[in-house]
């Protein structure tokens, strides 16, 4: 598997699907499944039956994972960009293709 170009804490833009165009911060990266969890994007609901711990039951809303191919890292201006790796001062860093700026994180 290739090195992860998207990391926890990155701001990303959703490129396809029901949340296309929305952006958020990566909360979790699931490398084995090639998925990411993005804050405020791809909200799913789980219906809970009443139980002893939760006597009222109800609907729990949570961020469901998105496939990593559906998101792109956002540049400083908030637009999606591709990412490449470069070596600077002997360290491997991520660089935004559009602007050429180093991505923090």
UniProtKB/Swiss-Prot annotation:
Pfam families found in the cross-reference section: KOW, ribosomal_L24
Molecular function, one GO term: structural constituent of ribosome
InterPro entries from the UniProt entry: KOW, Rib_uL2_dom2, Ribosomal_uL24, Ribosomal_uL24_KOW, Translation_prot_SH3-like_sf
Keyword rRNA-binding in annotation: yes
CDD domains listed in its UniProt record: KOW_RPL26 (cd06089)
SUPFAM superfamilies in the cross-refs: Translation proteins SH3-like domain (SSF50104)
A Gene Ontology biological process term: translation
Gene3D superfamilies attached to this UniProt entry: 2.30.30.30
Superkingdom in the source lineage: Bacteria
UniProt KW keywords: Ribonucleoprotein, Ribosomal protein, RNA-binding, rRNA-binding
GO annotation, cellular component aspect: ribonucleoprotein complex; ribosome
Similarity field: Belongs to the universal ribosomal protein uL24 family.
NCBIfam families (alphabetical): rplX_bact
Assembly: Part of the 50S ribosomal subunit.
Function: One of two assembly initiator proteins, it binds directly to the 5'-end of the 23S rRNA, where it nucleates assembly of the 50S subunit.
Descriptive protein name: Large ribosomal subunit protein uL24
Organism for this UniProt entry: Novosphingobium aromaticivorans (strain ATCC 700278 / DSM 12444 / CCUG 56034 / CIP 105152 / NBRC 16084 / F199)
